[in-house]
Structure formats: structure tokens, C-alpha cells
């Protein structure tokens, strides 16, 4: 695995690294959005990687907030990685000072590394898998504010109603990364941030419903109980999740589809959005168009809020 990941250092970025060529798909609120968006819908802010802030009625909920962006060489060579407080502080300028809850889809570092620090800064509670909760508390998150979430569970937090769904992680070189069973310890190196049980979430507030996962496999599609989905945020980082893209969009039938986890999460977010070396957004667009999938395909740029109409 180490040599395979190190090989990614030699993979060129796609020719158009940013969102410029897809400007017609990029959505954002006006510079001075109406106050009504606070009370009549859900406002979505993309935080990078698979991270999002959702706002409703003056409350905020985060999913997978990760800002530190450990460098690829440190990950490939399994060097110690730690949250970067200065980088996290800069990113949190775009997040509400108080956050009700953080949801985490799985225990990998690019989803969980910064969560204990974000909890400290925002007062948030954490809901995540048993593995992710153990990793977070070992990394300094207060146990009293960490709750284990399991598929089938449902809970309310602020204006939010959250349903927890089963999910799967894409395979990389034939297996899900960092999925081996091993004793959990204080995480220091990338491989210490174990996958655990992947989760997806159905988030409801103000008559809007958002589905979010971090990727998946064709054999596992979500069961939303027939609920209408306004926005589907679908991880498309690797081939497994792109292979299931058409099937999951047909299953969810969302009004809007937002492909996620397709930026280069080894590059600092201050450089702006750049597609990752293993992503293939052109495939996603082609699939949407050729198969005439339901809903509208959209993109969000870092820290530019958009309110679901």
C-alpha cells in the first residue's frame, strides 16, 4: 500500500485543475443573501474534501470537517500527522462560532483528524461510528460529547433530524484503505486512523432533506424510506463510487446532485479547488447526461454558501 500511494506522487493533475471550465455548474448564494434563507431552507457551505456546514434557523451542523491537509509524502511514508491549529482557525472563520453537532462518515484522517480540535473551538458534539468515536477520544475529544451512531439510528439535534444509514468505502488497489482489524490506539500515523464502519446520513430541517455519504460501492444503495431527497451529496473519489453513480442517483431521485470528495485533499485549501489525481469528473458529467439521470448536477466552491431552493 505504501509504495502504491507513493506512486501517486507521479500522477499528473488533470489539465484543468480548478472549477473554471465547469462555471455553469457552480452554485452560490448572492453576496448578500436574503435573511429568509436562515429560516425557510438549508444553507450549504462546502468546506473541502468531504466537509460541509449546514445551517438552518441560526444553527449549524458539520459533516467531516478536515482542513489540515496532510501532505501526500507524509501519508505515503506513514509519517506522523497532526492537526494544524493555524490552518484550522483560518478555515473556521467560514464556520459559525457555535456548532450543534459534527457527523463523521468514517474514521480516516481526511474525515476525522481535525474533529477534536473543531469540537474544542465550536462546542460541538460528535456522532460517528464506534471506531471513529474511539479514535476521536484517543486524540483528545471529550468523551462526554461523543456519541456512537449506528445504522438505523435516528436522533434530533437543534432543528435537525438525522437518520443514520449503512454505507461502504471505495476500494483502492483492491481493498478499502486502513480497514485491517487492529487494536485501536492514540492515532499518530495515517494508518492509525482506521476505517471502522462507514456511515451515510439523511439530514432534515425546514422541509428540506439532504443525503450525504463519502463514497460507496455498486452493491450497496441507500434506503431512505421513500423520503424525497432535495440534495444528494455523493462521494466520487474513486472508481467504485463512480461506478455506482447512476444507480444511486436513480435510487435517490434528488432535485440536486453534488459530487463530493473529488478535490486534491493533499493541497492546502488556500490554493483553491483543484481536482484530485484519481478523480474523473468528466465521467460523472458524461454519466449524468448520457443516462439522463434525474435532478440537476451542481458543484460548490470552497466557503461559498448556497441555499437549497
Q: Whereabouts are the PLM-identified features?
A:
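Active-site-proximal loop/helix segments of hydrolase catalytic cores
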Residues: 184-251
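Pre-active-site segment of Zn-dependent metallo-hydrolases
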Residues: 34, 59-104, 108, 113-117, ...
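Flexible, acidic/histidine-containing loops and adjacent segments that form or flank the divalent-metal
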Residues: 151-199, 206-208, 289, 293-309
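Active-site environment of divalent metal-dependent phosphoester hydrolases
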Residues: 50, 70, 107-113, 133-136, ...
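Active-site neighborhood of phospho(di)ester-bond hydrolases with catalytic His/Asp-centered motifs
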Residues: 63-64, 98-107, 127-129, 211-215, ...
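Beta-strand-turn-beta hairpins that frame and shape the catalytic cleft
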Residues: 37-42, 56-61, 154-163, 204-210
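Zn-dependent metallo-beta-lactamase
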Residues: 10-86, 169, 189
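Binuclear metal-ion centers of metallo-dependent hydrolases, dominated by the metallo-beta-lactamase
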Residues: 137-154, 250, 255-309
Amino acid at each position: 500500500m505504501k509504495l502504491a500511494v507513493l506512486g501517486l506522487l507521479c500522477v499528473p493533475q488533470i489539465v484543468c485543475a480548478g472549477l473554471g471550465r465547469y462555471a455553469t455548474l457552480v452554485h452560490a448564494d448572492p453576496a448578500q443573501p436574503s435573511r429568509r434563507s436562515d429560516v425557510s431552507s438549508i444553507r450549504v457551505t462546502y468546506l473541502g474534501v468531504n466537509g460541509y456546514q449546514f445551517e438552518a434557523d441560526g444553527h449549524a451542523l458539520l459533516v467531516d470537517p478536515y482542513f489540515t491537509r496532510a501532505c501526500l509524502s507524509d501519508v505515503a511514508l506513514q509519517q506522523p500527522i497532526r492537526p494544524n491549529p493555524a490552518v484550522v482557525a483560518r478555515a473556521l472563520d467560514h464556520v459559525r462560532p457555535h456548532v450543534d453537532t459534527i457527523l463523521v462518515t468514517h474514521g480516516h484522517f481526511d474525515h476525522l483528524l481535525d474533529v477534536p480540535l473543531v469540537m474544542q473551538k465550536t462546542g460541538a458534539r460528535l456522532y460517528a461510528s464506534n471506531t471513529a468515536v474511539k479514535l476521536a477520544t484517543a486524540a483528545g475529544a471529550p468523551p462526554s460529547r461523543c456519541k456512537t451512531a449506528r445504522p438505523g439510528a435516528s436522533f434530533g439535534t437543534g432543528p435537525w433530524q438525522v437518520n443514520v444509514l449503512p454505507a461502504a468505502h471505495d476500494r483502492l488497489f483492491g481493498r478499502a484503505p486502513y480497514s485491517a482489524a487492529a487494536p485501536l490506539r492514540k492515532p499518530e500515523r495515517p494508518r492509525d486512523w482506521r476505517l471502522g464502519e462507514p456511515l451515510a446520513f439523511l439530514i432534515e430541517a425546514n422541509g428540506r432533506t439532504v443525503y450525504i455519504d463519502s463514497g460507496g460501492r455498486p452493491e450497496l444503495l441507500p434506503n431512505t424510506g421513500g423520503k424525497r431527497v432535495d440534495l444528494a451529496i455523493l462521494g466520487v473519489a474513486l472508481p467504485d463510487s463512480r461506478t455506482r453513480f447512476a444507480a444511486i442517483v436513480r435510487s435517490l431521485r434528488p432535485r440536486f446532485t453534488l459530487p463530493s470528495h473529488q478535490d486534491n485533499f493533499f493541497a492546502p485549501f488556500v490554493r483553491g479547488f483543484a481536482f484530485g489525481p484519481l478523480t474523473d469528473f468528466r465521467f460523472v458529467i458524461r454519466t449524468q447526461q448520457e443516462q439522463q439521470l434525474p435532478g440537476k448536477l451542481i458543484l460548490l466552491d470552497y466557503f461559498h454558501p448556497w441555499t437549497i431552493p
